[in-house]
Amino acid sequence: MLFDALLVLSFGGPEGPDQVMPFLENVTRGRGIPRERLASVAEHYLHFGGVSPINGINRALIAEIEAELGDRGETLPVYFGNRNWDPYVEDAVTAMRDDGVRRAAVFATSAWGGYSSCTQYNEDIARGRAAAGDGAPQLVKLRHYFDHPLLVEMFAESISVAAQSLPADVRDEARLVFTAHSIPVAADDRHGPNLYSRQVAYATRLVAAAAGYSEFDQVWQSRSGPPRIPWLEPDIGDHVTALAERGTKAVIICPIGFVADHIEVVWDLDSEVREQAADLGIAMARARTPNADRRYARLALDLVDELRGDRDPLRVAGVDPAPGCGYSVDGTTCADSPRCVARITG
């Protein structure tokens, strides 16, 4: 077996009111964000008792991965580490070292390229290995999976379920809107270039086709920072207003940029955008994210199997496909899969 462990690597989130501000300070360290701005964002978490859904979802996902491994008759210890909150990646890698793990696959809970979606996870891996010191396991970050058949299937199915929740008299006229986390235009230009935005656009087309939609919109959400800095647009709030002005009576929002119910989903969409839509007379349904779906667990293990040499990469073919990085080793920059495979098996 190529790997003797799997590390689920994620963003992290607070699990109590007293953890919210320290968590936000971790997230924004070195960026000079005013404390009053952090206090404003903290209110979003405090609305939910100071608990982000993300850690609980990831623990449930790990349970599904372990169950799937059991169904396959495989034994592979699964570890959990975060960038910004307990359990930290440094502690997870140190635990793997202490347990005698020599090489682990790393499944990041982000399907995309770009800095915060990919490169920063490589930095997390390097930081975790440095903390573990001598004897740290080799860590192989698995590839981008924005075009994996199971991801496309889960989102397409969730759109159909969301559509059925709309009132029958407006269901057939509902506008499908895909949304992902906005980033500064300059940041998108630097990576790829435009790797993140191209991948989101391509995945949007794949999911829309799988769900049976020929017309749809793709927008961005949750921007922050000074207004003078351009971010990817259009913003979902502006777009919902524009839809209302065009007479749209119902909207299905698919948060394709999120593999789980981050606070940006349960607050920005389920609270703020839903309230805005209601004020504008628009019925809104939100498609669910993969969260801890068993198919998401299978997706993670599919990526592991690709590096074991058991199968070719699973990808949905479409028009004008977006590129995706392969695998990276020990926090290095992503490279094409064949070169990475040679590096870890040679």
UniProtKB/Swiss-Prot annotation:
GO terms for cellular component: cytoplasm. It catalyses: Fe-coproporphyrin III + 2 H(+) = coproporphyrin III + Fe(2+). Fe(2+) binds at residues 181, 264. One of its GO terms (biological process) is heme biosynthetic process. GO terms for molecular function: ferrochelatase activity; metal ion binding. Fe-coproporphyrin III binds at residues 52, 121. Pathway: Porphyrin-containing compound metabolism; protoheme biosynthesis. Its EC number is 4.99.1.9. It is an enzyme of class 4 (lyase). Keywords: Cytoplasm, Heme biosynthesis, Iron, Lyase, Metal-binding, Porphyrin biosynthesis. It is found in: Cytoplasm. InterPro entries: Ferrochelatase, Ferrochelatase_AS, Ferrochelatase_C, Ferrochelatase_N. PANTHER family: FERROCHELATASE, FERROCHELATASE, MITOCHONDRIAL. Belongs to the ferrochelatase family. NCBIfam families: hemH, PRK00035.2-1. Involved in coproporphyrin-dependent heme b biosynthesis. Catalyzes the insertion of ferrous iron into coproporphyrin III to form Fe-coproporphyrin III. This is Coproporphyrin III ferrochelatase.
